[in-house]
Regions:
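Conserved active-site and SAM-binding loop architecture
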Residues: 1-279
Length: 279
């Protein structure tokens, strides 16, 4: 990220600096509580902490993020989360548990009662892509699975979105395969557009964008669909078009001229192979 920040020029640099300082004025005085659905090994929380260190060095602004809520069904990944994320206050097994005010906390002994689910400023709404990935032989049969609330992808989004409707995090980020951009003649909206409408109905600004891995420093093509949703706390002051334009300018500014990492020096492994004790 330090390399990307160094490439910002002109008004984009000023806009970014202003945005970071504005965010810090609102939330920088106390720890930013974050959480994730479908956490895996929680690598996004580790990456987020690295970004905060860069912003501190660049702008002198101290952000402190506490990764307090995780959701993961696989037991070996639960063990990794417990070991590598000491800030965790609650670990649950399924997305459906996040729709309530209380849930069983896997960090505590089995005989403990349910605990209050912590409020989050930032929520990474992970949901499975298995119904719409091109690797699935049934992908073409699952177009609009999000709107139909079917399959792992449709049900996963439904359950994860319930957390938003119950707990109202300020910032929500989502990622899935680009198959959600497809639609058939009998539907007015693609699943991508449907997700945007779901957030807008609850007074969030929501921007969908298709990003390619090679544009941001990767050495191989890997397109993914992302959404950023921000709770609208200043109704009428800023238009959705202005917010969208700002995000698109940021995304364009951060595009890399080539790979930033020499992957020949590293071994890429699946996160399921990571040992619990990894540093």
């Amino acid at each position: 990220m330090a390399i990307w920040l160094g490439r910002l020029t002109g008004s984009v640099q000023a806009d970014f600096a202003h945005g970071v300082r504005r965010f810090h004025s609102l939330f920088g005085e106390s720890p930013i509580k974050s959480g994730c659905g479908c956490s895996g090994t929680g690598i996004t929380a580790k990456a987020s902490a690295a970004i905060h260190r860069v912003l501190n060095a660049r702008y002198g602004l101290r952000f402190e993020e506490h990764h307090v809520l995780a959701c993961e069904h696989a037991e070996h990944k639960q063990g990794f989360l417990k070991k590598q994320h000491p800030d965790l206050q609650m670990l649950v097994s399924t997305l459906a548990e996040l729709a309530a005010a209380e849930a069983k906390n896997l960090l505590n002994p089995q005989n403990c009662p349910k605990e209050l689910i912590p409020f989050l400023l930032m929520f990474r709404l992970g949901f499975p892509c298995t119904s719409r990935t091109s690797l699935s032989s049934q992908s073409s049969e699952n177009v609009h699975c999000v709107q139909k609330e079917e399959g792992a992808t449709g049900i996963g989004f439904k359950e994860g979105f319930k957390y938003v409707t119950v707990h109202w995090p300020f910032l929500v980020m989502l990622e899935c395969v680009k198959g959600l951009m497809q639609k058939t003649p009998d539907y007015q909206l693609s699943d991508m557009e449907h997700i945007v409408k779901q957030f807008e109905a609850r007074k969030y600004w929501c921007l969908p964008v298709l990003l390619d891995n090679v544009d941001y420093g990767g050495d191989s093509w890997r397109e993914r669909l992302w959404w950023v949703a921000v709770l609208n706390l200043i109704h009428g002051k800023v238009t959705k078009q202005e917010v969208d334009q700002f995000f698109f300018r940021m995304l364009h500014a951060f595009k890399s001229p080539g790979p930033l990492i020499d992957t020949k020096r590293y071994v890429i492994i699946d996160d399921e192979d990571l040992p619990v004790s990894i540093a």
